[in-house]
């Protein structure tokens, strides 16, 4: 049986973590002094929280401990010792936190320091969720939490901690944008998700499990760019493919968030099928920018390598394969040079030079570059800072975000549910948003 499957066995997992704790950690982490410091920190945290609870009770009653009043106190205003409860913090586990209580009416007492059923206090869970966002698997999260909590949580419990963010995710997806961006980048990324079937099988532990089959789905996503240069992921939606119907549903959701014809100046895409009709229906009249990067990249699919023999002799290339690589590199470089122009007139003039130079040898590639050429210059027709043109004439910003998601998908193999996939998408998007806002604040 593989190591990954044996980790589902609680006894095996406990022994595995004990070995890590005993032999896998540096000596300074296991030293007596380090453990003593840890105990002192936990005791200090416990003292501070208990003092905060005592201050809260004083503010609630308006009377100090042992303070008498002539008319006496009702049970609802009389202290009655304390009870002990467990609390887990980012510093460690507090086994016997003393919480003050009243003789009667404890249900009406609302604590601010800790909530009634709060088991994990402070940013401890947030830190582990961020670890998952940064690339830790659920088993990595399980091991990290075991070192903090001193006990082992099941994989299902770790998964519930991550999925707890799903409520925030749903609220974010339905919340209208406070300030809709003038530039919207849209694209799709294919993901692998496991879906349950009607079959039931028994695992190695004899437990009955629903059989899942992996299926391909596309995550449609939208990224907004503002004139100050910062950008954010605004919306995403799982679909079976990039069709007119799925894009219509996607832009309908964006419209409800406040992305309308009045707020949007430009939509940037890579020419996905079905996108044009959805744009005409929901954002009629809005300029549509075709991604320049994809436009140039696709030229390689239309190369016919005409007159390669003469070119091969000119460069003294020893092989046809090397000559083809040189041809591809040269024509892509020239296509990129076309879009280096600073104005529309300059770019069109460069396009004519490109056509004259390559028409005889690569007619299909030249025709593909000039097809819908006006759509690749749509970014020049709107009122937006030219210094930010590189951000709005391609979908590279969105592709960069997709790269992070692909890395995570490679780590985990496939997502076990649509909810898990969307939750990770939300976590990564919020992380990128925080980085963008921090960078914006530093520039102000």
Model-derived segments and spans:
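Short alpha-helical segment immediately N-terminal to, or the first helix within
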Residues: 130-134
